[in-house]
Structures are given as C-alpha cells and as structure tokens.
Design a protein with these regions (language model features):
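Acyl-donor binding region in acyl/amide transferases
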Residues: 1-23, 27, 140-191
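Acyl-donor-binding surface of acyltransferase catalytic domains
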Residues: 1-62
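Flexible glycine/acidic-rich beta-alpha junction loops that bind and position SAM and/or redox cofactors
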Residues: 28, 34-35, 132-136, 175
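Hydrophobic helix-cap positions at the C-terminus of alpha-helices
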Residues: 52, 104-107, 191
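A conserved beta-strand-loop-helix scaffold within acyl/acetyltransferase catalytic domains
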Residues: 59-171, 186
Length: 191
C-alpha cells in the first residue's frame, strides 16, 4: 500500500526506536481510503440533499482557478467560523488564505474543491487535491526541473493521479446539522 500524499509511512520498528529515545505519541491522526462511485452514497445522504434542493438559497459548486482570490476569501470566511474556534487554531487573515491558494495553484484540479453557499454567502467547503504520491513515487526522491515537468504533465495532461486526498472540510456552525456536508459530497459525486 502506497501512503497518501503528505502522510508518513514508517516501518513498524520505528515506534519502538523513537520511544527508546524518549519520544512519545502526541496525537493520532487517521486517514481513511474509500473508493467512491456514483450511486454509492447512503440513502440518508440523498434524502438530506433532496431537502436542501427544496430549500431556496442553497448552492453547491466547484471553484474556478480564474477567480482564485475570491476562492481564498470564501475559504478564509468559512475557516474562521468553522475552525478558529478550536483550541490551538488561529484565525486566518486574507494574505495567509491567498498564500495557501497560490501554493496549491499548480496542483489544483477545479473539480476537487467545492463550496457551499447560502444566499451567495459561503457556508462550507471541501478542499481535495490529487494524490501526488501516485505520480512522484517514481521520482526516487528527486524533484528537479525535469521531474517538476513530469509531475505537471501527469496531472494536467495524462490525469495519472487516480486518488484524491481531502485536505480540509468545514461548515460554519450555524449550518451544522442541515446537511451541507451531504450537499457538497453529492456535488462531488455528480462531477
């Protein structure tokens, strides 16, 4: 099994090795792999989506790279409402949000970043990127100009990344429990 992009893989003996040096586990972060096919979502997801579709004002759509500044601002607004309330998480300013989107720009696939809106105000997002490990695994740890070109060709022309990695998901607190996450996932399924 090849780990997802940005997820470490360490042989089993690493745990004991690090613990012998005095390191301790800080927290467990789990990543799940699931194959998604059209029509595979549970009936409850489709029911919640149907209720949303019957309610006026809700809109779900993927982004356009031509409008990345607005995407960054929508991301910031939802992030600050959904994530900045957690301890250890700071609010994000405009520059930081725009910097994040610019860093992601080369690998962004517009069909992998979705926003939810209510009366044209952003209320949720799901940001995914192609799993780069499927492509860069053959680079043997080297990332010079030639491998950068190979990566861009594999992502933009050959579409060799056949898995995606969900980076972050957020819904503003006032819309929790209303099925916004179901609407975003259903929109992704339709694409």
């Amino acid at each position: 099994f090849q780990p997802l992009y940005e997820n470490t893989y360490n042989p089993p003996y690493y745990k004991e090795l690090f613990e012998n040096y005095g390191f301790q586990n800080y927290f467990n972060q789990h990543t799940y792999l699931r194959r998604l096919e059209v029509g595979q979502l549970s009936d409850s997801v489709y029911e919640r989506v149907k209720r949303l579709e019957e309610s006026p004002g809700y809109c779900f759509k993927h982004i356009s790279k031509k409008n990345l500044e607005q995407v960054a601002e929508d991301f910031r607004l939802v992030y600050n409402k959904a994530w900045a309330l957690f301890s250890g998480v700071k609010a994000m300013d405009r520059e930081q949000a725009f910097r994040i989107m610019n860093i992601l720009r080369p690998i962004i696939d517009e069909r992998l970043i979705y926003f939810a809106y209510y009366n044209d105000e952003p209320i949720g997002f799901f940001i995914m990127v192609p799993d780069l490990n499927r492509v860069i695994g053959s680079f043997n740890g080297k990332f010079g100009w030639w491998n950068k070109l190979r990566l861009m060709w594999a992502l933009k022309v050959a579409h060799k990344a056949d898995r995606v990695l969900g980076l972050i998901f957020g819904v503003t607190p006032e819309f929790h429990g209303k099925g916004i996450e179901a609407g975003i996932i259903r929109e992704f399924e339709k694409a």
